[in-house]
């Protein structure tokens, strides 16, 4: 008896992935937008179509395309076979019945300001957040800080207010905020977590654009959490990105820096363009010209602070 040969899909060893896409500068053509929407699941098309503002729709679209690109290229799952779901907290995840060679495979996305960003790891728990430094929409910076007083510890406020100029204070505010959000997204608890339970000891205070640093330490309820590592970077002059990393079993891992590890690492963000996003894409639905017509009538305004995919 002759048995048919089995087909094996070889998956190369996967390393951590860090991608960013400038949705703020992306002005999609009709062809690009219609191709993009044909390349995502119908329920996500419906969700994106409900956004009132173009910039929100573009950021959400970029996030979905980055996730599908990640799964297609790193897990070797054909684009049109990828099934994404959402947890009860709304976090995008790969469907449990998907063929995945990495049981602990984890990814997370964030979009705010001018960028959508993605972090993925084959073995580590991961959370990511991006924040753009910008002046408050209403009131002065001191008034804004007063409103947000309960979000940070006294020590964190000392660090934030330790700089003379208000713009640098805002920089430090959003850097701290990105760190806290990255942790909360990594553990998947969503709203309701008391942010003052978290305290970050920032190091170094100044970050160079394009470098990645891992010296910042986390204290939870006053105790240092040594099993967590935090990658910090600046994509450009105004955007901070924080990536929280932890082994699923909570043990210390190699990405946690030693006490004398003061040099930046080289796991930098790769800036993708639209052609990169759809390089592996397979259209899954018929073309829908009305989706472009609706998009053209939306206004282009900044994403609201805190908007996440």
Swiss-Prot record:
Annotated compartments: Cytoplasm, Cytosol
Main localization of the protein described in the UniProt heading: cytoplasm
A Gene Ontology BP annotation from the UniProt entry: lysine biosynthetic process via aminoadipic acid
CC cofactor note: Binds 1 Mg(2+) ion.
Keyword list, A-Z: Cytoplasm, Magnesium, Metal-binding, Phosphoprotein, Transferase
Any GO molecular function: holo-[acyl-carrier-protein] synthase activity
UniProt entry tagged with the keyword Transmembrane helix: no
Post-translational modification Phosphoserine, affected residues: 258
Cellular component annotations (GO), alphabetically ordered: cytosol
Binding site for Mg(2+): 129, 181
Top EC class of this enzyme: transferase
EC number: 2.7.8.7
Cofactor: Mg(2+)
Reactions this protein catalyses: apo-[ACP] + CoA = holo-[ACP] + adenosine 3',5'-bisphosphate + H(+); apo-[ACP] + acetyl-CoA = acetyl-[ACP] + adenosine 3',5'-bisphosphate + H(+)
Keyword hit for Plastid: no
Binding-site residues, CoA: 47, 86-91, 108-111, 181-185
Family: Belongs to the P-Pant transferase superfamily. AcpS family.
Quaternary structure and interacting proteins, as annotated: Monomer.
Role this protein plays: Catalyzes the post-translational modification of target proteins by phosphopantetheine. Can transfer the 4'-phosphopantetheine moiety from coenzyme A, regardless of whether the CoA is presented in the free thiol form or as an acetyl thioester, to a serine residue of a broad range of acceptors including the acyl carrier domain of FASN.
Protein name: L-aminoadipate-semialdehyde dehydrogenase-phosphopantetheinyl transferase
Organism: Pongo abelii (Sumatran orangutan)
């Amino acid at each position: 008896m002759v048995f048919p040969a089995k087909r094996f899909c070889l998956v190369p060893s996967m390393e951590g992935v860090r991608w960013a896409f400038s949705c703020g500068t992306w002005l999609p053509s009709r062809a690009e937008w219609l191709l993009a929407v044909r390349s995502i699941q119908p329920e996500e098309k419906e969700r994106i179509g409900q956004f009132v503002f173009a910039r929100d729709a573009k950021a959400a679209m970029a996030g979905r395309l980055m996730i599908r690109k990640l799964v297609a290229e790193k897990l070797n799952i054909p684009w049109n076979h990828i099934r994404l779901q959402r947890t009860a907290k709304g976090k995008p995840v790969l469907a449990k019945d998907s063929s995945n060679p990495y049981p602990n495979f984890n990814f997370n996305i964030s979009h705010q300001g001018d960028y959508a960003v993605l972090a993925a790891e084959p073995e580590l728990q991961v959370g990511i957040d991006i924040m753009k430094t910008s002046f408050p929409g209403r009131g002065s910076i001191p008034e804004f800080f007063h409103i947000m007083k309960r979000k940070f510890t006294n020590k964190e406020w000392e660090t934030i207010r330790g700089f003379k100029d208000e713009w640098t204070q805002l920089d430090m505010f959003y850097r701290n905020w990105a760190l806290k959000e990255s942790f909360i997204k990594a553990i998947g608890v969503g709203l309701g977590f008391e942010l003052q339970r978290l305290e970050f000891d920032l190091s170094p205070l100044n970050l160079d654009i394009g470098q990645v640093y891992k010296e910042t330490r986390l204290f939870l309820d006053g105790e240092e959490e040594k099993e967590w590592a935090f990658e910090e970077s600046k994509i450009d002059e105004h955007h901070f990105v924080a990536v929280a990393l932890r082994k699923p079993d909570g043990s210390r891992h190699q990405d946690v820096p030693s006490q004398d590890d003061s040099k930046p690492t080289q796991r930098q963000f790769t800036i993708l363009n639209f052609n990169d996003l759809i390089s592996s894409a397979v259209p899954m639905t018929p073309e829908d010209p009305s989706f472009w017509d609706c998009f053209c009538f939306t206004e282009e305004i900044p994403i609201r602070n805190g908007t996440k995919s």
